[in-house]
Regions:
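Sequence-level detector for compositionally biased, low-complexity segments
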Residues: 172, 227-228, 253, 269-460
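Eukaryote-specific, cytoplasm-facing alpha-helical/coiled-coil scaffolding segments in long proteins
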Residues: 12, 77-78, 82, 140, ...
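Short alpha-helical "patches" and their helix-cap loops
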Residues: 2-11, 72, 97-102, 284, ...
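Charged/polar, low-hydrophobicity segments characteristic of intrinsically disordered regions
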Residues: 7-31, 151, 371-391
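Long recognition/docking surfaces used for binding and targeting
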Residues: 1-61
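Intrinsic-disorder/low-complexity, polar/charged segments
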Residues: 37, 41-44, 93-95, 143, ...
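Alpha-helix initiation and N-capping motif
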Residues: 3-6, 22-25, 45-50, 115, ...
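SAM-dependent methyltransferase catalytic region
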Residues: 44-45, 49, 56-312, 322
Length: 460
């Protein structure tokens, strides 16, 4: 069955291929064979799949990578998230990943690394493995090639655990779909139904599933650099409205475009997907800019209200800086895939905890660390429950600041101009303001030469 799936994928490629493309792909396949020949463990296989297909997508589909924000997650991060979720499930709900009715969803599965590593983690007991695989693991992917790879990857991991002689079972928990589109319209589950008739049934089943855990690496791309890039992000009316209503209302900056970044949409969609009566856990590795950005104050305030506990492991790596600050931020977790700061965020919605605001725990990985050093630290910590990981309690101020809290002294200063024009009751220095000397014709009205200026003025 794995061969059949792979052959279907190859047939689709071959139907559109030309000789030049085939030659390039042949070289790619040769490199896969050479690198895979010496791999003898599950972690190594996952690592090579991530590295090869990350390189493949960047080379073959650069615009798709930019539009969808495709970056593949290091194994150390994946394992940290999986074990953190299991530990927090025990702490908050007295349940484990292995337990019945703990449905787990990876909404942006890519090559299926999160579900595959979950199967390989040993956290699912052998007696629960078949039930979990057949009924309680769910994944979505919108890129066709990645969808096929993920299906094969997950199926292969499951059958490796079963051993020889067991009947082959396909993984029916994966859907070829746009996660954000689910819930937008009643027809959303019909996506790709003509090509894949079973897909609609899978999407319908997933929408009915009582999801308790959502994990993954959501897309990051906020916007295209130019209209000519043809890499614009799709809008989602209902989801965008929810973001505007819940995350946008406390924002005082004029530019709130970053609130519609796909990773913020992922948090909003996932929050709405969890059932309020049962609660659950969301754990994403994502752009970490939301922790400090002024434009995300509404997002911070909202998750503080909607969840009972929040863990933020800041991996830093902001390379949209320069000089000493850039060196201090350290290596980029995703290498060349992203220049933004990265954070692992775990959100707990426990309906039994009656509190208006979440407890917030924060850990900064540290200064001047290389990418390899950061991944080594993540591997060593293993989970948010590790006592070696020293959490700092965060108590946001009324402005929604989590880090670098602003001083209220500025608000006591006398302003130069009134908030409202011509407000005679304003305690400002000036009541009236104007644009000053404003000609609308500066090239004609100013000149270093008195003679030339005189000529210009006489011609006006």
């Amino acid at each position: 069955a794995i061969s059949v799936s792979m052959q279907t994928m190859l047939d689709l490629l071959e139907a559109q291929a030309i000789e030049k493309d085939t030659a390039v792909l042949d070289k790619f396949y040769d490199s896969v064979r050479k690198r895979a020949s010496d791999i003898d463990n599950a972690e190594g296989r996952q690592r090579i799949i991530i590295e090869l297909y990350d390189k493949f997508f960047k080379t073959a589909f650069p615009k798709m990578v930019e539009r969808l924000g495709i970056v593949y997650t290091p194994i150390e991060i994946v394992d940290f998230i999986i074990h953190s979720v299991n530990d927090v499930l025990k702490k908050e709900f007295d349940r484990t990943i292995s337990d019945e009715n703990i449905h787990i969803l990876d909404p942006f599965t890519g090559t299926g690394t999160f579900i595959t590593r979950l199967l390989q983690s040993g956290l699912i007991e052998k007696k629960d493995l078949e039930r979990k695989y057949l009924h309680e693991l769910h994944a979505n992917e919108i890129v066709l090639l990645a969808y096929y790879i993920a299906a094969v990857n997950i199926e292969n991991a499951y059958h490796d655990l079963l051993g020889d002689g067991k009947e082959y079972q396909s993984f029916d928990g994966i859907c070829l779909t746009d996660t954000f589109q689910l819930g937008e319209t009643p027809e959303s589950e019909q996506l790709f139904s003509e090509m894949f008739p079973q897909n609609s049934e899978r999407v319908a089943a997933q929408k009915k599933a009582p999801i308790r855990v959502i994990i993954g690496n959501p897309p990051y791309s906020a916007k295209q650099k130019s209209t000519n890039d043809n890499a614009q992000n799709q809008s989602y009316t209902k989801l965008d409205k929810r973001i505007s209503e819940l995350y946008g209302k406390d924002v005082k900056t004029s530019n709130i475009n970053t609130l519609y970044n796909p990773y913020i949409k992922a948090f909003r969609w996932s929050t709405d997907r969890l059932e309020n009566e049962n609660g659950g856990i969301i754990c994403f590795v994502s752009d970490g800019g939301w922790v400090e950005n002024n434009s995300h104050v509404g997002f911070r305030k909202c998750i503080e209200r909607e969840f009972s506990a929040i863990y933020v492991f800041n991996l830093r790596g902001n390379q949209r800086t320069s000089g000493e600050l850039s060196r201090k931020e350290g290596g980029k977790i995703f290498g060349s895939g992203s220049r933004t700061p990265i954070a692992i965020t775990l959100l707990v919605k426990n309906p039994k905890i009656k509190s208006e605001k979440a407890t917030i725990q924060y850990h900064d990985i540290g200064d001047y660390l290389s990418r390899e050093e950061k991944l080594s630290i993540v591997r060593k910590f293993h989970s948010v429950s590790n006592e070696v990981l020293k959490w700092k309690n965060i108590f946001p101020n009324e402005h929604g600041d989590w880090l670098g809290e602003r001083s209220d002294v500025f608000e006591t200063f006398i302003p130069l101009e009134p908030t409202s024009k011509f407000d005679s009751l304003s305690p400002s220095f000036f009541i009236i303001n104007s644009l000053g000397v404003f000609t609308n014709r500066d090239p004609w009205s100013y000149n270093f030469s008195k003679k030339e200026l005189s000529v210009n003025i006489s011609r006006m």
